[in-house]
């Protein structure tokens, strides 16, 4: 049975990805951070192949603890999906002084440094997996060239997601020669899932709709695995 660890799995895209991979017969390890959400526990009660791990991607100690638990549970991992993210305050920019640089740092810790820590900590298990696939959820706001007309954007999320893309590029340089394959995905503007399972009215897409697309992209082989590209929910490539 193939296995995957998914971060930020409490709700939204992460939860939808858990459901998708469970439906495809995978063993799923789900990183849980939000105590006020019990949607993962509801899923675990229906499927014994879902295992919940306490996991704060912004904490090196939490990642190390999760890796230790996983090493006692499974001998290998086939796929890692780095989905957890922190948006940061929307008014954090030079347009709304004083700028909260601590908020910028918190977003960097989760969105850019967290995925690098995840790969480093879970690499021994991934080395023993058959697929060796690393998947990262990024964003259109990570594209530096495309942000030139969006001067009022808050700083934390775009800056940290652009940094994530660079980190993925450096990981690709090192790990592609070791038979690792990579996926970088822009999911679009998704509705927020509430603790009771309902969806917010704002945003465009149901996370279950995007989750099905993302799961196919993450699981299936590409024609050219050597190229590192960022792909959106329509299959279009984005510059980064």
Regions found by a protein language model. Give the residues of each.
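Catalytic loop of short-chain dehydrogenase/reductase
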Residues: 86-90, 94-108, 116-117, 127-176
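Structural signature of the Rossmann-like NAD(P)-dependent dehydrogenase/reductase core
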Residues: 6-7, 82-83, 133-139, 181-186
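Conserved Rossmann-fold cofactor-binding substructure of NAD(P)-dependent oxidoreductases
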Residues: 58-73
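Conserved glycine-rich Rossmann-like NAD(P)H-binding loop of the short-chain dehydrogenase/reductase
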Residues: 24-40
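Rossmann-fold cofactor-recognition segment
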Residues: 44-61
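N-terminal Rossmann NAD(P)H-binding glycine-rich loop of SDR-like oxidoreductase domains
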Residues: 10-20
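C-terminal helical subdomain
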Residues: 177, 184-187, 192, 196-240
């Amino acid at each position: 049975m193939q296995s995957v660890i998914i971060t930020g799995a409490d709700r939204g895209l992460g939860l939808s990805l858990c459901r998708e991979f469970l439906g495809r017969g995978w063993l799923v390890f789900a990183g849980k951070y939000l105590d006020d959400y019990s949607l993962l526990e509801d899923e675990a009660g229906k499927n014994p192949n879902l295992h919940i791990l306490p996991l704060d991607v912004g904490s090196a100690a939490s990642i190390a603890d999760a890796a230790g638990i996983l090493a006692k549970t499974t001998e290998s991992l086939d796929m890692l999906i780095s989905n957890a993210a922190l948006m940061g305050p929307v008014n954090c920019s030079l347009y709304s002084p004083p700028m909260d640089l601590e908020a910028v740092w918190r977003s960097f810790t989760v969105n850019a440094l967290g995925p690098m820590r995840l790969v480093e900590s879970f690499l021994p298990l991934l080395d023993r997996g058959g697929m060796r696939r690393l998947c990262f959820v990024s964003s259109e706001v990570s594209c530096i060239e495309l942000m030139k007309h969006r001067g009022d954007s808050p700083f934390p999320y775009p800056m940290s997601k652009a940094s994530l893309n660079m980190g993925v590029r450096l990981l690709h340089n090192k790990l592609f020669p070791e038979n690792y394959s990579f996926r970088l995905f822009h999911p679009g503007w998704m509705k927020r899932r509430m603790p009771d399972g309902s969806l917010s009215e704002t945003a465009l897409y149901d996370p279950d709709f995007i989750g099905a697309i993302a799961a196919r992209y993450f699981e299936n082989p590409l024609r050219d695995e050597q190229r590192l590209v960022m792909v959106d929910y329509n299959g279009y490539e984005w510059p980064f």
